[in-house]
Amino acid sequence: WKIFEKYSWDSKIGIGYPIPKVVLQHEPQVTVIPISSDEELKRISQKRNLALRDSDIPVIRQYFLREDVLRERKEVELDLPTDVELEYISQARSDHCNHNTFRGLFRYHNLSTGQKEVVDSLFKTCIEEPTLELMKKKDWVISVLWDNAGVGRFDEDNYYVITGETHNSPSNMEAYGGALTGIVGIYRDPMGTGKGSKLILGMYAYCVGPRDYSGELSPHLHPRRLLDGVIEGVRDGGNKSGVPTPYGLLLFDESYLGKCLVFVTAMGIMPAKIGAESSHKKVTSPGDLIVMSGGRVGKDGIHGVTAASETYSEHTPAGHVQIGDPYTQKKMHDFLLEARDEGLISFITDCGGGGLSSAVGESARFSNGCRVDLDKVPLKYEGLDQWEIWVSESQERMIIAVKPEHLDRFMELSRKHAVESTVIGEYNDSGYLRLDYKGKTCAYVRMDLLKSEFPQWEFDAEWTPPRLRGLAEPVIAEPEDHGSLLKDILARPNICSRNWIARQYDHEVQGGSVIKPLVGRQRDIPSDAAVIRPVLEKKKGIAVSQALNPFYSQIDTYDMVAATIDEAVRKVISVGGDPEHLGGVDNFCWPSVEYDPVENPDGKYKAAQLVRANWALRDYCLAYGIPLLSGKDSMYIDGKVRGPYGERRKISGLPTLLFTVCSVIEDVTKCVTMDVKFPGDLVYVVGETSDELGASEFYQRMGHIGLNVPKVDAKKLFPVYARLARAIDEELVASCHAIGRGGLGVHLALIAMAGELGIDFSLDEVPLVSQLSPYRVLYSESCGRFLVTVSPKNKKAFEQIMAGSPIAPVGKLTEDPFLNITTKGHTILKETIDELKGYWKRPFGDLI
């Protein structure tokens, strides 16, 4: 605050605009790190939040003590390692950046059957190999598994780009800032893919504790405050970037009190060719200039990747949360597209996790060396140490390789768009990463160090099947009041309306929206998938959807992943997606899998869960023909939360997979939505219902987990999906909806609420694997099912196309606004559509 003297007061100026200014009374300096013993280096790692693994520490020491290395370092006036070098190595070796867990060696043991298997790299065996195998069969797959995002063919003139990421740790610390930088950060991945793409879409998924949690634990942020901040952060990041946000998910569970999950996904589009070169190819060459464009570097975002590679606790550094500025990034986005189109960009990547350390360090591998002048890096304020400049994750920055002859034009375009661009170094083929500060070398590390000399992480994985863990099917008699039961389930937090979130996000910007996030007569029911037209002159579009169901992990993570993939596929098929063009993005969030008898006594079981999840990923991507265009693993979704007596309790999040599926649609005018359309239309159930209520919404309501988790028979289901896709393409389907969480009863209510029409529905006609009681038919969550409405005039043609599939006409749409469900001639449920919708909307209402 400030006191103004009367003589100094100017009524025209008033108090003015006080602008915060950071002033650091600190002279930048490089610190030499003593490495006399492994224990000493381990203490330094803990003190500096480096998250170095014990097995990595001897390798680092041995490297810096080698005679040949010492001799070379003396030529640049270095001896012992510097803090800059140690920070660089720890960033590059972090699980967040190097995916050490997924590249690790797992010794799997099934304690029930005695089966033993050694899995050498989950990434290689379950992600890379299946994707490369499918890439040979799918000519639309352009680029996978090496760049910032995957690339697929949209048409002969354009490629689409897709990727996904999480921003869990920073969002858990500071919800708004963490989520905002999460969404603008994922936007930079398509911008840094190939020679750069235009952003066309963003998506979100949040997993948090119960919004109205009132238990005895005290998480760092209450779930309500956390969720509000996350929603606002993604809103500001997306809306202010001019990128539509047409799809999202939200899930509540107490296991996320320790650490929330914030998934963000982005898509872009780029011309297939830039001049005579394919747009997805890029390389750095000796002599290319290293240019940093966009924002400046500050102390925000330091140790982001290492904080994300550990359990969240009271010791997690607050400084790892970045500060985002979407307007700066929007200007940079437009500038870089213009520079790309003029052929000025040889290579581009974003400064995300690890900052310059990651962006320059990884891009220099192509040329096999680089030199960076850290004193040339633009700073938000003076006083940053050299290591802070190098690893800071300050936002809105890209690294571009520019030929010297293109520099003047590149800088001219940068000034035109009011974007700051600075030459900070040069790529070379020296075999070294060299960092200088005011003419003095502060880092000198061989390029091959990180590739060749560190040991593979190893894990013991012990699987105990669910029955041996004490899980069993509960004994529940048939409910007497099905109407009240359905209304109760519709009002549950993981089923009810989330319109208050979707309506905050701009999905119409850029003008390409085809199927919106909310559909139906009142535009208030969530759609199965989003469909956009990225090229407005064409009818061609992209359908994209996501699925998330971690509750099945309580029984078996293999089935959880299978069901999640199947649901995402069905959602895309239901709007008109092409079953021959399904691209996937896998985003794993997993609790720590490293066994520790005190800190993580169930680590071996969690490791086995991860192995089984990846086996399912491999099996079902191959079965459905889904190459994994991109993906991300975010481990350590554990947190230590304060209890009522001051104790700290560890909470591990449910093993979680967010699976994204995208598909190219030839003609978006043939797309369908989930809302029922016309009285008199026939209602079909496509797919069989089994006794599969394990970990279902119904069992949760009854206080049980159960045992019979939904299973997926891909060989049986995929031909059905192909036939349904053909029926939609031939315009025989009026509406189509994938049945998901909650089962048949919930999704009958949703399609009726969307279309504001009644449904007369007979449970006796539903295709069943075996005889089931009414509540099991209504609330089983069997995979592979759809609700489809068809005009009577199209009945014959539809059934001919679907021949050989488990389908049945089970009801009819009526003008009377009732959901009327009968079995054996008796009505067991009759509720007005308005009342059902009232219960569905009641929990959160209109919170905007």
Predicted regions: what is each one?
Residues 1-848:
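Glycine/proline-enriched, intrinsically flexible loops and inter-domain linkers
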